[in-house]
């Protein structure tokens, strides 16, 4: 199978490395210097240092050429850009007349200005296309690139897209599950990043494992309430893309969003944290959108409110936690 991966960050590189073990895989980056470095060193020093990339993986800086590689009905395109870049890539595909027959995206979050989920952006930009979906689940790029076991879910209204994605990814140490609850999968992927900041704050303050368990459990309830309000199915949030992704992101030391919380608890400013991180922390990007949508829909999300208060309103992390503890008692 021919596969094009658009985006050579850590996640795009890791997925391309996995795909190249079985398929004719092309990894695209708009930065020609990065493409040249990848081809020469067989390592993504910038985003995934220390991981050797397979000799079969090829690299491309020309978007039209990369899209042409994945045009056939038996091919697949994987969009590995962050949420902020998804709409632009869809427009570029449309304008080039090179929309792949089947494609999936792997970004998580809401678009900042419109508060739209990824599938809504795609539908706006490519209204005549149908075979697309989201690939998501509990996964750190470095572990995938190292060939360690991982389980992901592809969600799409298109059986053809689900089948093509399954055929591309389901091999080696990667297990793929399929479904059609695109909204549920996307909401889980967005909200868990915000909740991971909360658990990072709690851990950074030394509040203990009991507090972490409470935050994960009550955070899952917040995620489920919002997801169902937006049209997702409740059972999706107890699966890989809900509870699974939340556990990993909230507790794993490779989690960028958890790292943000830990550093906030240590007294560092958000600007300094993000500058030192050097990578996207989607929980920071979409926290406002999550809270705004929740308020609009009448969904109670106190943990998300506390995270936003720390991120954007200057509330001290310990004061935000105290506010949560002072909430009135209620039935679970």
From Swiss-Prot:
It catalyses: sn-glycerol 3-phosphate + NAD(+) = dihydroxyacetone phosphate + NADH + H(+); sn-glycerol 3-phosphate + NADP(+) = dihydroxyacetone phosphate + NADPH + H(+). Sn-glycerol 3-phosphate binds at residues 108, 137, 139, 192, 245, 255-257. Keywords: Cytoplasm, Lipid biosynthesis, Lipid metabolism, NAD, NADP, Nucleotide-binding, Oxidoreductase, Phospholipid biosynthesis, Phospholipid metabolism. GO terms for molecular function: glycerol-3-phosphate dehydrogenase [NAD(P)+] activity; NAD binding. Its EC number is 1.1.1.94. Pfam families: NAD_Gly3P_dh_C (PF07479), NAD_Gly3P_dh_N (PF01210). GO terms for cellular component: cytosol. NADPH binds at residues 11, 30, 108, 141, 256, 280, 282. Pathway: Membrane lipid metabolism; glycerophospholipid metabolism. It is an enzyme of class 1 (oxidoreductase). GO terms for biological process: carbohydrate metabolic process; glycerol-3-phosphate biosynthetic process; glycerol-3-phosphate catabolic process; glycerophospholipid metabolic process; phospholipid biosynthetic process. Disulfide bonds: none annotated. The active site is at residue 192. It is found in: Cytoplasm. InterPro entries: 6-PGluconate_DH-like_C_sf, 6PGD_dom2, G3P_DH_NAD-dep, G3P_DH_NAD-dep_C, G3P_DH_NAD-dep_N, NAD(P)-bd_dom_sf. Catalyzes the reduction of the glycolytic intermediate dihydroxyacetone phosphate (DHAP) to sn-glycerol 3-phosphate (G3P), the key precursor for phospholipid synthesis. Belongs to the NAD-dependent glycerol-3-phosphate dehydrogenase family. This is Glycerol-3-phosphate dehydrogenase [NAD(P)+].
